[in-house]
Amino acid sequence: MKASIFFVAMAVGVAGNLPEWPQFGGPNRNFIVDSKGLADAWPTGGPKKLWMRPLGEGYSEISVDQGTLYTMYRKGEQEVAIAMDAATGKTRWEYAYNASFGNMAMENGPGPHTTPLILGNRVYTVGILAILNCFDKTTGKLLWSKDLYKDFPGATRMDRGYSSSPIAYKNSIILTIGGAGHAVVALDPADGHLLWAKNDFGNSPGSPTLINVAGQDQLVAFLNEGGPAAQGLIAGLDPNNGALLWTHPHKTSWGLNIALPVWGDDGILVMSSAYGSGARALKLTREGGKTTVKELWANNRMRVHHSTMVRVGEFIYASSGDFGPAPLTAIDVRTGEIKWQERVFPKASFVYADGKFFVVDEDGGVSLATLSPAGAKVISKVSLLEHNAWTAPTLVGTKLYVRDRKSIAALEVGR
């Protein structure tokens, strides 16, 4: 897949194996991995539990590299970046720092929300107050730290804390911040100094992604025009310098979006949001150095809140719904036609590998399923976690890593 090019390009002077799950969404930032040897069904009691341990508040995904897991959690008034042995769950190192939640909205927990980024021998984390920390991934030594809200005055402060996971491109780390002149910024991974800052949009809780349009790398992000009646939009930028290449309207209530956009090799980009907008598909083409954006369809019945969207073939699968029921939905990326909607799980996130979906629903169920245009089939299911289990699972080889707001666990899902 073309997306794999980006992670190869961003390795900063490091040879050898790349991280197995280096960032939000996995190697290609699309919740699809190339794992083989996965079981076609689980025993009655569920897959073998390798270990389970207490962790703490937070929705950070679990990043993985060379037998070590990296994530974040909250302990009282502190945020904690933690590294754990993938085989045992034992702590290898952790780093705690003060991060008062203050007057931010607490009803869904205090975060942290972002996923650690692994790059070479370093790991990068961002907390609810937009503190970007760089650690030696082996020792946990803090190498440098940046207060993004302080460094970029007027940056968008989200009601539930900063939640946009960073992405790496070539020799830079790119973050959406919001604000005049610095809607999107790029920093040097070595020391955090500013490489570029561009554009005048507001930020949202969602994370950016990288695509390639006819040979040109582009950063895609959901941004907004700010103000009390924020108007959301999808933006394409040059990740080399932040230059704005194109925008397309995608209005949502409060100018918010959380779900990661989905890109296909056919040039179709799909963005789906809760908060009133639904899903929208854009066909991107490029000629004469200019990108042309054509809206293919819009469908308000596909409203993905904070869960994952996964494209397999010509269909995208995701839970559609805001704060009520969220039926599992299959939508044709070419036409916007809803093929089916079924209440198979509560609101759920998943990762796809070897023809199977590994599902974590918000009530704590962990499932093995097959999804196709013909419908959904739950093969196996076990109750393991507690509500709200909103973190997407991580799959590395035949090991599935899952968490909720109290615990983290490792499961063996191989044959």
Predicted regions located by residue number:
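Noncatalytic, solvent-exposed loop/strand surfaces
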Residues: 15-415
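Hydrophobic h-region of N-terminal signal peptides that target proteins for export
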Residues: 6-16
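Positively charged n-region of N-terminal signal peptides that target proteins for export
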Residues: 1-4
